[in-house]
């Protein structure tokens, strides 16, 4: 079992021991789809929303859709207050947003999506390591639920 101390954080989980995972669907009522995802002590709220228009850079006569992602650590999600990022994502946050968005687009047929633009927001409520992987998983669940709702609505 791995046991080491890094400041005041002590990890006693074995290297091959899985973290507990909990998924609560439809956590927020206003999003197209939402997921409260817990992986160990990491907690993420992923919400899928539909934009009225495709991105400005998309061709006007586009028949395929687009999926984007946003990622944000809430100020109280880490052991010391995380400063909110203003005027767009920077550095680490931007890299994670791109990773999540590309992962989502790799798992969906944008042609089948039709001319819809979906954004999945991943808000980290508590960060305890593994936020990238947990965000991708939570975002994919929210995207899947959102697409299912669009299909059910006949869109």
What are these model-derived regions, one by one?
Residues 25, 41, 73, 122-124, ...:
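Short, structured patches in soluble enzyme cores that scaffold and shape functional sites
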Residues 130-155:
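Glycine- and Gly-Pro-enriched alpha-helical subdomains that act as flexible
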Residues 95, 99-103, 119, 138, ...:
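Generic beta-strand or strand-like secondary-structure segments
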Residues 7-20, 110-117, 152-155:
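Flexible, glycine/charged-enriched surface loops at secondary-structure junctions
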Residues 1-38:
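Short, Gly/Pro- and small/polar-rich lid/capping loops
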Residues 27, 32-113:
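Glycine-rich, flexible beta-strand/loop modules in the N-terminal catalytic cores of phosphate-handling
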Residues 85-89, 122-131:
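A short glycine/serine-rich beta->alpha loop
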């Amino acid at each position: 079992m791995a046991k080491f101390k890094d400041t005041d954080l002590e990890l006693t989980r074995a290297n091959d021991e899985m973290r507990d995972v909990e998924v609560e669907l439809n956590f927020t009522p206003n999003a197209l789809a939402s997921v409260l995802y817990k992986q160990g002590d990491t907690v993420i709220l992923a919400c899928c929303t539909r934009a009225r228009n495709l991105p400005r850079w998309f061709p006007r006569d586009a028949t395929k859709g687009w999926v984007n992602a946003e990622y944000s650590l809430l100020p109280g999600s880490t052991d010391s207050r995380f400063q909110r990022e203003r005027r767009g994502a920077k550095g680490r946050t931007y890299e994670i947003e791109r990773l999540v968005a590309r992962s989502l687009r790799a798992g969906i047929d944008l042609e089948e999506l039709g001319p819809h633009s979906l954004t999945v927001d991943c808000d980290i409520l508590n960060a305890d390591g593994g936020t990238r992987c947990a965000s991708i998983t939570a975002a994919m669940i929210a995207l899947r639920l959102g697409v299912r709702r669009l299909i059910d609505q006949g869109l």
